[in-house]
């Protein structure tokens, strides 16, 4: 079983991290191609492309300039400890044990606009490049065209290594769009998290993001290796609702204070 999650815009390269054996990202040849394209852009062009402030555009231009294909613990850190944000608040990697992280290394992948697909212990340098960015390359008009085949093949390879065919989609729609389901020999299940508010159940973005992280954590800490076990997920107060779930979409509901 393999779960995929989105990355985060917020990064942390200051706090202490556990001393674990890190790994090299697997797709840096492609990352280098994107870096080469981004280095040709001015800060103003980066700001326009990414819809960010002049300050952030300058920071990203500097990061593209500083990026090195060789990753080490001086210029990078393990991806699972670098990402911060709602999903990663739910995941709470800092409280996971070394054994948990090793399980995650085989069962969790992070989609990335620059790195394509990251394992938890893969080294990652600071960057910002969202998957929806319309960055034109020799492969097409945007990152979906650049990464689609590559990421899908990488996911298939990871599933083949496990001898399993179940993919849990815990990524946002923006990031999952890069995956080509028709080219995966896999059963894909998308958990949907609904909160009861103002008289009805609906997806509330902040809560849904955190819930994706919570389910990732549950999968890791409970050593989930069979899809049916995920129906017992109850972190954060969510409960599986069989009556509204389908084979492809599993619905988890929660009542929150009005």
Swiss-Prot record:
It comes from the Bacteria. One of its GO terms (cellular component) is cytosol. One of its GO terms (biological process) is response to hydroperoxide. InterPro entries: YaaA (IPR005583). PANTHER family: PEROXIDE STRESS RESISTANCE PROTEIN YAAA, PEROXIDE STRESS RESPONSE PROTEIN YAAA. Belongs to the UPF0246 family. This is UPF0246 protein Asuc_0575. It comes from Actinobacillus succinogenes (strain ATCC 55618 / DSM 22257 / CCUG 43843 / 130Z). The lineage of its organism: Bacteria, Pseudomonadati, Pseudomonadota, Gammaproteobacteria, Pasteurellales.
């Amino acid at each position: 079983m393999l779960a995929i999650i989105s990355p985060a815009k917020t990064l942390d390269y200051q706090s202490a991290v556990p001393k674990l054996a890190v790994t090299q990202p697997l797709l840096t040849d492609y990352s280098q191609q994107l870096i080469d394209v981004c280095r040709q852009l001015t800060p103003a062009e980066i700001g326009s492309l990414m819809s960010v402030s002049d300050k952030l555009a300058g920071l990203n231009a500097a990061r593209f300039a500083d990026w090195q294909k060789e990753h080490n613990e001086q210029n990078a850190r393990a991806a699972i400890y670098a990402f911060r944000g709602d999903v990663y608040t739910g995941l709470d990697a800092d409280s996971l044990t070394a054994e948990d992280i090793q399980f995650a290394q085989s069962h969790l992948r992070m989609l990335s606009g620059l790195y394509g697909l990251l394992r938890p212990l893969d080294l990652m340098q600071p960057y910002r490049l969202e998957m929806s960015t319309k960055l034109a390359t020799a492969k097409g008009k945007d990152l979906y065209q650049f990464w689609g085949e590559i990421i899908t093949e990488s996911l298939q390879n990871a599933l083949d290594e496990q001898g399993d065919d179940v993919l849990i989609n815990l990524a946002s729609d923006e990031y999952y769009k890069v995956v080509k389901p028709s080219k995966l020999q896999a059963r894909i299940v998308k958990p949907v998290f609904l909160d009861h508010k103002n008289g009805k159940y609906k997806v509330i973005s902040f809560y849904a993001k955190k819930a994706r992280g919570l389910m990732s954590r549950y999968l890791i800490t409970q050593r989930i290796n069979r899809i049916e076990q995920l129906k017992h997920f109850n972190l954060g107060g969510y409960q599986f609702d069989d009556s509204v779930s389908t084979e492809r979409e599993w619905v988890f509901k929660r009542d929150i204070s009005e």
